[in-house]
Amino acid sequence: MLELWQTEWCPASRRVRQRLTELGIDYLIRQVPVEKDDRDALRAAVGTETIPALVFDNGEIAVGEEAILHLLDTALAEPAEADAHRQKAAKARRRYLEEECECSQPATP
């Protein structure tokens, strides 16, 4: 099973998770500490403290959003339902921002 080394707060990690989901790929998430000095497990597994990093079943490692997405997009065919998933995710994200967290609301003095 693929292993994604990532953090929840990282926008690049989020985009990689989204793409893996669109492609219907199961993967294991490895949470990485915020501080680079605390990333010994990541360094041991992939040789760097950069996130996101994706480790494939065959031992191949891709580091960084651009490298991971390029590898996924060139190696795998997108399933028919990927676009529908993308649209639903974007709609849910907008709804959350508008209704739940009120992030898009202007600050009131």
Set out the residue ranges of the language-model regions.
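GST-like domain detector, emphasizing the conserved glutathione-binding G-site
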Residues: M1-E8, A12-P109
